[in-house]
């Protein structure tokens, strides 16, 4: 079974980018509430 590196990279980016974006927004809101 051959692994499609481009599909794997696209999937990883599709998951990592929104997650890190939400994480940054959450940290900013949590720090401003202090």
Swiss-Prot record:
Query: What protein family is recorded?
Result: Belongs to the PsbM family.
Keywords attached to this entry:
Chloroplast, Membrane, Photosynthesis, Photosystem II, Plastid, Reaction center, Thylakoid, Transmembrane, Transmembrane helix
Any GO CC annotation of this UniProt entry: photosystem II
Q: How does it sit in the membrane?
A: Single-pass membrane protein
- How is the subunit organization of this protein annotated in UniProt? PSII is composed of 1 copy each of membrane proteins PsbA, PsbB, PsbC, PsbD, PsbE, PsbF, PsbH, PsbI, PsbJ, PsbK, PsbL, PsbM, PsbT, PsbX, PsbY, PsbZ, Psb30/Ycf12, at least 3 peripheral proteins of the oxygen-evolving complex and a large number of cofactors. It forms dimeric complexes.
Q: Which Pfam families match?
A: PsbM
Q: What is its main location?
A: plastid
Membrane-spanning residues:
5-25
What this chain does, per the record? Answer: One of the components of the core complex of photosystem II (PSII). PSII is a light-driven water:plastoquinone oxidoreductase that uses light energy to abstract electrons from H(2)O, generating O(2) and a proton gradient subsequently used for ATP formation. It consists of a core antenna complex that captures photons, and an electron transfer chain that converts photonic excitation into a charge separation. This subunit is found at the monomer-monomer interface.
Q: Does the keyword Membrane apply?
A: yes
Give the UniProt subcellular location, in the record's own words: Plastid, Chloroplast thylakoid membrane
| BP GO terms, sorted | photosynthesis, light reaction
Protein's organism: Chlamydomonas reinhardtii (Chlamydomonas smithii)
The record ties this protein, via InterPro entries, to: PSII_PsbM, PSII_PsbM_sf
What's the protein here called? Photosystem II reaction center protein M
Read off the lineage from the record: Eukaryota, Viridiplantae, Chlorophyta, core chlorophytes, Chlorophyceae
